[in-house]
Swiss-Prot record:
Interacts with PKN1. Interacts with TRAF2. Interacts with mono- and polyubiquitin. Interacts with PEX6. Interacts with PEX5 (Cys-linked ubiquitinated). The modification Phosphoserine is found at residue 49. A zinc finger (AN1-type) spans 143-189. A zinc finger (A20-type) spans 8-42. One of its GO terms (cellular component) is cytosol. It is found in: Cytoplasm. One of its GO terms (molecular function) is zinc ion binding. The A20-type zinc finger domain mediates regulation of NF-kappa-B activity. The AN1-type zinc finger domain mediates association with TRAF2. Keywords: Acetylation, Apoptosis, Cytoplasm, Metal-binding, Phosphoprotein, Protein transport, Transport, Zinc, Zinc-finger. It comes from the Eukaryota. This is AN1-type zinc finger protein 6. Zn(2+) 3 binds at residues 163, 165, 179, 181. Zn(2+) 1 binds at residues 14, 18, 30, 33.
Amino acid sequence: MAQETNHSQVPMLCSTGCGFYGNPRTNGMCSVCYKEHLQRQNSSNGRISPPATSVSSLSESLPVQCTDGSVPEAQSALDSTSSSMQPSPVSNQSLLSESVASSQLDSTSVDKAVPETEDVQASVSDTAQQPSEEQSKSLEKPKQKKNRCFMCRKKVGLTGFECRCGNVYCGVHRYSDVHNCSYNYKADAAEKIRKENPVVVGEKIQKI
């Protein structure tokens, strides 16, 4: 019995390598690549292409002739190119002189910069050695808070009463008439009233 084999058509990819499936009707290309191919052909037909085949045929038809006389000519050409590539001694001397001049300029600039930095360091050290008045004031010890009664020398701590005369008193001697306070309450009150209640005077009548 004859065995029948069903050959299923395997889908092939586009011949341009775009990743889509191609069609044998469009020369193995997808529809997009086939349209681009047709557009390129139409545009190339409008332009005059150079006869590349004729050039290649002429190059193949002409044999390369190499004679003994052509070898020395090539050797002389190589010698001339090598001699042109070698640097001239004049150019080397000029480069050396320029490098020496640049190094001298750098050394002089460094020498100028060194004394400037020394002056700056000296000024900074002078200012650091002279303490300012504010620092000296801040270093002073703060005054100890009085914690004893000025009259009976009883230790009051936080329960003491500070009077306007500047002393601290206990609960018994806190009144001004008890400890003979030197603060003038009357003058202070009169000054306060004078500031809060200024005298209002009307304008003088100008005679015609």
